[in-house]
């Protein structure tokens, strides 16, 4: 499963792009973030081996690949930008629903 998040209206390479998971009835879970300027990536240990974050600067798009999806990966996934100086998630995408049949 590959999710995409196209940026607009700001300097793509000046902000971290975060990915956040929300399962039905549960809270938000931070997956990780990538800095488009150099592709530096920081992942929640829980998602190492599960989520791969990449960016395409030419199309100002961030991607998240989920490896070997299972029903546990069924959730709404959000991308959200954060400035480098405080990491506050200040602008969120609308979310993408992923359903994996068991």
Residue ranges and their predicted role:
Residues 1-102:
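Extracellular domains of the immunoglobulin superfamily
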